[in-house]
Regions:
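Glycine-/small-residue-enriched transmembrane alpha-helix faces in small-molecule transporters
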Residues: 2-46, 154-178
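Hydrophobic transmembrane alpha-helices of multi-pass small-molecule transport proteins
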Residues: 132-149, 290-309
């Protein structure tokens, strides 16, 4: 039996694409909020390792029961794995400082990626930046500044980390756009998962072998902490995160293959809305006024850039 979501789309299906996109961002926003919640119980490297193992199991089961294992072989391995490396670095910066910043700062920092895509499009893709894109960049810069609040006494590098994540996410988008358009969603997810697994294994080994100052370990236990005891609670969390991650990424990949990206991309920003809702449910937190205005500026900039690509 083959699932429709894995078949090659023969025509645009905007309603199906919209539903898939909303399901995808809903699942990923839930996962990302859960990761912040779990920073006191696990480490980034343990999380990546255990989650990746479960995702690999799910991928092979899905491939076996739907399209077969041939779909997992990339047509262009080098760009596929280069993109996966960009995503792995992106996640390192996105989750690395999660215990020190708000969920709103995490999400809005990551969603500066359309601004970086615009900046990188000229040197890497040969695209020209017109006045609308320049205005969007200015608006996005204002939003990022409001979000970072660099003049505050409590400002730290942790607040910059999600924006660096946005830069590497932009590299992923550009590689995907130029070299990976014909790859299967399962192929792309498999490559990402394999790279995440390697990052988890080598990161765990590095943290164990390299001697770090105890103050450094104490300030970033999620990133530099030793491998914690693998409890049933952590395993359940990693299994849940694996399911949410796989669901979210498959839905988003298929959504952008079954409708115009210029129509869907503005709706991608509903991730920030879902992230805010999950943050309220799990942490009882709501964004501050400056964070809210910053998010609005970043979303507006992304929408302007998207519509000018039509």
């Amino acid at each position: 039996m083959k699932l429709t979501i894995f078949d090659n789309p023969k025509e645009d299906r905007p309603q199906m694409a919209l539903a898939l996109l909303l399901i995808g961002v809903f699942a990923l926003a839930f996962q990302d909020t859960l990761v912040k919640f779990m920073t006191s119980y696990t480490t980034f490297w343990q999380f990546q390792t255990i989650r990746s193992i479960f995702i690999l199991c799910i991928i092979f089961i899905v491939a076996q029961t739907t399209t077969g294992f041939k779909i997992l072989i990339p047509q262009n391995p080098l760009p596929v794995f280069l993109r996966s490396t960009m995503l792995a670095i992106c996640m390192l910066f996105f989750f690395g400082g999660a215990s020190h910043i708000t969920v709103a700062q995490m999400g809005a920092g990551l969603y500066t990626y359309p601004l970086f895509v615009t900046l990188l499009a000229t040197p890497l893709l040969g695209e020209k930046i017109g006045p609308f894109r320049l205005s969007a960049l200015a608006l996005g810069t204002i939003g990022s500044t409001l979000l970072l609040n660099p003049f505050d006494d409590k400002f730290s590098f942790f607040q910059v980390m999600p924006i660096i994540a946005g830069l590497f996410y932009a590299f992923n988008i550009i590689i995907l756009r130029k070299y990976c358009r014909k790859e299967s969603p399962l192929t792309l997810i498999l490559a990402v998962t394999l790279v995440f697994l390697l990052f988890g294994i080598f990161g765990t080994a590095g943290v164990a072998v390299v001697e770090l100052d105890q103050n450094v370990r104490a300030s970033l236990p999620f990133l530099f902490g030793q491998w914690p005891n693998l409890t049933l609670f952590i395993i359940i969390f990693c299994v849940g995160a694996a399911c949410l991650n796989l669901l979210g990424n498959i839905c988003l990949s298929r959504a952008y293959q079954t409708a115009e990206s210029s129509w869907l991309a503005p709706l991608d920003f509903t991730y920030l809305l879902f992230l805010t809702i999950w943050a309220k449910i799990i942490f009882g937190a709501i964004p501050s006024l400056s964070e809210t205005i910053g998010m609005i500026c970043i979303v507006s900039a992304g929408v302007i850039i998207t519509f000018k690509e039509k």
